[in-house]
Amino acid sequence: MSSTTPKRSEPADEDMEVEVKRSKVETDPKSTQRKYEDFKAQMVTLANQLKIDLKVKHNADIIGSIVMAACTGNAIRETGKYSFFFNDEKDGWKLREVELNCKPVIDWANQTLTDEQKREWYPFLASLQLCVKTEDAILWQRNPVTRELQVSPVCEPFATGYNIKDKLKKSRPLSVGPLNHLLHWVNLQTEKSVGKGRKLSPRAAAGIRKRLEATLMRQTIGQSQKAMLRQIFDGKLAYVRTLAHSYCSIKPHIENQFVLPYSVIAVTDSFENADMSSEWVYKKLCEASKKILLTGPNESWKTFMAQMLIYCTFRCLHEDLGVLTSMFGMVFEPRKSKGKYCKSSELQVLGSQEITYKFWSKPQRGAPRNLGGARRGQICTRPSFRGVRATYNQYSSLEQLEKACGNPTSENVVEALNAEFEDTQNSPLKAQGRSTKGGLPMSTKATSRLQASFCLKFSLICVCNFCCFLSLLLGIC
């Protein structure tokens, strides 16, 4: 008989929110390596019980999500029923429901993730969950944040991370889109609940608001945008739409990390020298792609599901598709071309597809100031990779942006924003670091040639009709 393991004790809301402590800076170069190794070890422990093949992406995703749930204190059953693919000699790969004993992983998490260890583990787990939840955001395109804020879905690139746990959002606040923090702040104005009937005390609510306000001010780089934020904090919520749409041109600060998803972790033999920013990540993804058996509705989805590994690893779901095409040497398919995704029970094993890269770049960490959406391509992009690229600003004023989005400017207080829009538009190129070819850094001259070629390639590739604007919900088009 299955039983539910209670969640590990958490600090009181008031203490947790008012006295938020910074995550411990990891100075140990082996820290990321050990976390990958420990996480994989727990995946293997679960899979070995029933000889579940972790090369199958669906299997690895289910096992990985169980380990993640145990690590983050979710109430999961010690014995639960899950569906995995098993290879039958007669019928090939078939889904079969089995009972899995999760208690060993639950016990490991309870012993390992003490309050002290959470400060070291939660930033890693937050980055990992941001990575794997990217797939849900792409496949289902629910856009809950923009819908609740009542702004155009064109702003969804700045709501990234909406679907990860709140306790993990606090560990990587600058990696979560500012619209998430803004929605949380707005909701606190009318609702003091933290779920399941629990109410926040006034002191705890004030602590949360203060933390959210500080994060939003750090992520917002335009001075006029900051002034608008102060107006919102004073209760003038009519400015929310205007601020959200201004992010489409004056991009906010959203930090990115490169993280291996569950399916790549499962088939990686060595995590030596692991990090979240170098060519190591590219190499491990390419090596793993030869082993991973992709799953999807049918064979026509195979290339798209291979590209899904890229989207998740580099969190580049809102990146310019021309940039991705230049980097990985394959044409990236728009989400709208694939139609509706299927139920888990209708998945098929599609086999493997090798991923290669022509050059690599480090993750984008600062705010990409001079990067608008391509005028004839994606309505709005959010760069994930550092590098020089051309800018094709979609709009020359906030009024044009809001007119296209169907939202009138709340009040006539956007002159400063329009001036910043103009400054942004007048800068055709913006350096954000170096792109690197093959495996070794190149000379400045070689890098410049690559950057010029890089800009030309994606400028030519990103050509499609502007009238598809309303259908481009997530910028993956």
Swiss-Prot record:
The gene is P5. Belongs to the influenza viruses nucleoprotein family. Residues 1-32 are annotated as: Disordered. It is found in: Virion. Keywords: Capsid protein, Helical capsid protein, Ribonucleoprotein, Viral nucleoprotein, Viral penetration into host nucleus, Virion, Virus entry into host cell. Signal peptide: none annotated. Residues 18-32 have a biased composition (Basic and acidic residues). It comes from Dhori virus (strain Indian/1313/61). GO terms for biological process: symbiont entry into host cell; viral penetration into host nucleus. GO terms for cellular component: helical viral capsid; host cell; ribonucleoprotein complex; viral nucleocapsid. This is Nucleoprotein.
